[in-house]
A protein has these predicted regions:
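Gram-negative outer-membrane beta-barrel transporters
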Residues: 72, 90-168
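Conserved C-terminal beta-signal and adjacent last beta-strands/turns
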Residues: 140-208
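Transmembrane beta-strands of outer-membrane beta-barrel pores
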Residues: 3, 15-21, 31, 62, ...
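Transmembrane beta-barrel architecture of outer membranes
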Residues: 10, 41, 51-53, 103-105, ...
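Outer-membrane beta-barrel translocator domains and adjoining extracellular loop/strand segments
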Residues: 24-32, 37-40, 70-71, 76-87, ...
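Repeated loop/turn-to-beta-strand initiation elements of outer-membrane beta-barrel proteins
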Residues: 7-11, 62-68, 116-120, 156-163, ...
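Residues on the lipid-exposed face of transmembrane beta-strands in outer-membrane beta-barrel proteins
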Residues: 1-5, 54-60, 106-112, 149-153, ...
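Outer-membrane beta-barrel signature, preferentially recognizing the C-terminal barrel domain
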Residues: 5, 17-74, 91-105, 111-113
Length: 208
């Protein structure tokens, strides 16, 4: 939907319904050893995952976007870590279905060039993750975020200096979690022959 003739303001809506079937390896009930103390085991009782995805995006000047939406999962397949009943020193991973798992999100992208020699670009995604593992359970939820920021300084003689930040909150999947992660990278680039040849010198994850 366009708000004006030059399409400076636009509204874009999307909806889709999807089905994801479990892989043969996820259904295979035989154990697959992954290390001396752990193994994978399939679950032949897995059900397909049904997903309803919808979003609406406001676009300004073909560059700035604000999106809100949701991904609603029924019988989402997740991996669970468990302890072997016969030997507590051994663990295994098995796939199981979550009865419901809904992700409600807002996403923002904002490129900006305040000066001829400075380019800034930032994006942010915030997510509310609501989970009901079994039909008789109550929902429990988490807030998640993903952030990226990029600053590029154009220097004389076709040099450029680029600083990057990436941040991810603690993530949750099955009965496990992944700790938050923040990285800062710095890259110096030199171009020759109208940009056809590029050399890069950089350091990733400077503060860790």
């Amino acid at each position: 939907f366009y708000f004006d003739e030059i399409h400076k303001w636009m509204l874009i809506g999307q909806y889709g319904r999807y089905i994801e079937r479990p892989t043969f390896s996820a259904l295979n009930p035989n154990r697959i050893q992954t290390s001396e103390y752990s193994y994978l085991i399939g679950n032949p009782m897995l059900r397909p995952t049904y997903i309803n995805k919808f979003s609406i995006t406001l676009v300004y000047n073909f560059r700035y976007t604000l999106t809100v939406g949701g991904n609603l999962h029924h019988d989402l397949i997740r991996q669970f870590g468990k302890e072997d009943a016969e030997n507590s020193d051994i663990s295994y991973v098995i796939n199981e279905n979550h009865n419901r798992e809904n992700h409600w999100f807002v996403a923002i992208t904002a490129p900006w060039q305040p000066l001829n020699w400075l380019n800034l670009n930032a994006s942010f995604i915030g997510v509310r993750q609501d989970i009901r593992m079994y039909r008789e359970d109550d929902y429990f939820g988490h807030f998640l975020y993903f952030a990226n920021a990029n600053a590029t300084v154009l220097l004389p003689s076709d040099y450029s200096l680029e600083a990057q930040y990436n941040g991810v909150s603690r993530l949750y999947s099955g009965n496990s979690g992944i700790d938050p992660r923040h990285t800062f990278n710095l890259h110096l680039r030199k171009k020759w022959k109208d940009g056809r040849c590029v050399a890069t010198l950089g350091v990733d994850n400077i503060f860790n």
